[in-house]
Amino acid sequence: MTFERLGQENAEAYIAYLRTAMREEPEKMTAETVDEEGIRNRVSDPFYAGTTSILAMDDGNVVGRIEYHFYGCMQDGYRMAYVDWVYVLKAYRHRGIAQMLFAELEKDCGRNGIDQYYLIRARNEEADRFYGSFRGAAMEDVPILRRYLEA
């Protein structure tokens, strides 16, 4: 297992991974289709430069990923990371890949002076078991405000 940052050189493998994930578990995906052309454009769009996707690679194929952002607060200098996506293909689960992806995130956090991350976790039995295995982490029910803006 190797780990790579998503970029133009592995975008096609990433798209193939998303197609597989969409076919296997469409209910866990946040989109109805894989926006292949959009992905090809986003990997080089400066707007997404602050987004990091680490891909778990097995023999040239993407089998899992973690996507996150670093950000900070001007007022107090607080630095943190937000994880917005973690997914491992069904055939590769229970092999420690998700834990390895989080380890890659934590190394990147350390290199950037970040000492905590958070995520809005999925609400299903498998996710609860996985996140429940984290040491030094708290699973909280935090009220979230989400508002979709009209274009």
State where each predicted segment sits.
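A short beta-loop-alpha structural element at the N-terminal edge
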Residues: M1-A16
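Conserved GNAT-fold acetyl-CoA-binding loop/helix
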Residues: Q8, M22-R42
